Regions:
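Short amphipathic beta-strand/extended segments in non-transmembrane regions
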Residues: 1-38, 163-164
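A short, glycine/Asx- and small/polar-enriched loop/turn
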Residues: 8-12, 43-44, 79
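Conserved residues at beta->alpha junctions
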Residues: 18, 132, 167
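Membrane-helix entry/capping segments
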Residues: 150-175
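A short acidic, helix-capping loop that chelates divalent metal ions and anchors anionic groups
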Residues: 3-7, 91-96, 170-173
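Mid-to-C-terminal secondary-structure elements
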Residues: 22-37, 47-155
Length: 175
C-alpha cells in the first residue's frame, strides 16, 4: 500500500507492506533493535510496525526509535503505528541495496492491522512465499502447496495459481 508520512525530518512517501510474523525469515532480515511483531499482534490486528535502520535514520535522524509512533496516511485515512522493531539487512553477498533521495520508506505491519486502509480485503492475498529446508525437493513442495490451495479453494485444474522459483526470477533478470 502506498501512502505518506510526515516527521520532523520532512515529508516522505511510504510503502506499507502487509505481513505476518514470519516476514524476517522470508525477507532475510536481522533485528537490530526491539522485536518483530508477534503472532498475537497479527491475530489481534495491533497497530505496530517494523522499519529498517536506514529508514529510521531518514525519518527521525536515529535508529533508536522503539516505542515511538509514526502516522501514515493512505487513501485519505491516517493511522498511527507503534514502532516495535528496527531491522538491518543481513549480508548475503548476492544483492545490492541502494537508497536514493525520494525513495519511499517502508513500514512492515501485520496484515490484519491494514483493514482500515483496504477494507475487508486485508485477508485476500495475491502472493505468498514458501520456504523449506534446502534438503527438501522444491518441486515436490511446490506441487503439494498448489494441491492444498486448489483443495481448500475448490479450484482443482483451474490454473489459478502460478509458481515462480528463485531461478525463474533470476532468469527474468538476466534476459
Amino acid at each position: 500500500i502506498m501512502g505518506e508520512t510526515v516527521t520532523g525530518k520532512g515529508d516522505f512517501s511510504a510503502t506499507v507492506t502487509l505481513e505476518t510474523q514470519d516476514a524476517p525469515i522470508v525477507n532475510n532480515l536481522a533485528l537490530k533493535r526491539g522485536t518483530y511483531f508477534t503472532e498475537a499482534d497479527v491475530a489481534e490486528g495491533r497497530n505496530v510496525c517494523v522499519i529498517s535502520d536506514t529508514d529510521a535514520k531518514r525519518l527521525f535522524g536515529s535508529d533508536d526509535v522503539i516505542g515511538m509512533d509514526i502516522d501514515v496516511q493512505c487513501y485519505d485515512l491516517t493511522k498511527s503505528f507503534r514502532i516495535v522493531g528496527i531491522t538491518t539487512q543481513k549480508e548475503n553477498g548476492t544483492f545490492v541495496s541502494y537508497t536514493y533521495e525520494g525513495m519511499p520508506v517502508t513500514l512492515s505491519v501485520p496484515y490484519t492491522a491494514a483493514v482500515d486502509f483496504v477494507g475487508d480485503t486485508a485477508d485476500e492475498f495475491t502472493s505468498m512465499v514458501v520456504q523449506a529446508d534446502k534438503k527438501m525437493d522444491s518441486q515436490v513442495i511446490s506441487k503439494e502447496v498448489i494441491k492444498t490451495l486448489e483443495k481448500r479453494h475448490q479450484s482443482a485444474g483451474e490454473d489459478y495459481y502460478q509458481l515462480q522459483s528463485f531461478q525463474d526470477v533470476m532468469k527474468m533478470m538476466n534476459d
